[in-house]
Regions:
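Segments forming oxygen-rich coordination pockets for charged ligands
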Residues: 1-111
Length: 111
């Protein structure tokens, strides 16, 4: 089982908010492929989207979203000198915020 998936299950069981950041698009060279994910809580992270400054920026963005109550966001990162990465490609990340709100189901009008 992927580390992020096990962490997601654990967060859901403990009603802990988290952000799931996923690589949704690539251009050129990058350290990880489309579909790679990292799960970020207020004090931990699970799995990897490639390490380095890209991952550092992604973790910082995710934690800011947790603090501010952000919504799903897509951000494009060039993997060049500005991130201190030599891959030279571009990575597009989707950040999905999962809060601790419990969902309930109400059924009515069944007859």
């Amino acid at each position: 089982m992927k580390a992020w998936l096990a962490a997601q299950w654990q967060c859901e069981q403990q009603n802990q908010a988290y952000v799931l950041a996923s690589i949704v698009a690539l251009q050129g060279s990058s350290p990880r492929g489309v579909g790679s994910k990292i799960l970020v809580t207020k004090d931990k992270q699970f799995d990897s989207i490639g390490g380095g400054h890209l991952e550092y920026k992604a973790i910082a963005q995710a934690r800011e979203m947790l603090l501010q109550g952000g919504q799903t966001e897509i951000i494009d990162y060039p993997l060049g000198a500005s991130l201190g990465q030599c891959c030279g490609g571009r990575v597009t990340l989707m950040f999905e915020v999962f809060s601790v709100a419990k969902m309930s189901v109400v059924v009515f009008g069944a007859g």
